Regions:
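A polyanion-binding, active-site-adjacent surface
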Residues: 2-134
Length: 134
């Protein structure tokens, strides 16, 4: 099974989860931002890695906007070089709108992580030879 197939299988299982009140909105960026997430997997997820960094609890201004782990918008657009459309989730919270790559907000942990990677490895390709962030 490829990494993309594994992720799609997990997404299908997660989509089966149902929540009751007080939960009103559940964002799954692997659905509405799949295009960018797929690009990220294909561009940076292949091959053997020495280090895999796992994140939890995606923030509202990072992966929730872009579909990319630690997906600080500027880093996704300029350093990782990903382009694409992010759709709206079925139910959107009015205080947490999904603006995708147009979001003006910055995600602090993503800015730090990708900033370190850019400073240390210069290009995402060099970083991805050894590291995979998920």
């Amino acid at each position: 099974m490829s990494l993309t197939e594994i992720i799609l299988s997990a997404v299908a299982e997660l989509d089966g989860l149902k929540f009751t009140k007080p939960v009103e909105c559940v964002y799954n960026p692997l659905n509405y931002a799949w295009d960018l997430h797929r690009q990220y997997l294909e561009k940076f997820g292949s091959g053997k890695k020495q280090v895999v960094m796992l994140g939890m609890n995606p923030g509202p201004f990072g992966m929730v906007q872009t579909g990319v782990p630690f997906g600080e918008v500027q880093a996704v657009k300029t350093w990782l070089g990903l382009k694409g459309q992010v759709h709206k989730p079925e139910v959107e919270h009015p205080k947490r709108p999904i603006l995708g790559l147009e979001s003006p907000r910055s995600e602090v942990s993503g800015r730090r992580l990708w900033g370190w990677a850019a400073q240390r490895f210069v290009t995402p390709k060099r970083f991805a030879r050894r590291f995979f962030v998920y």
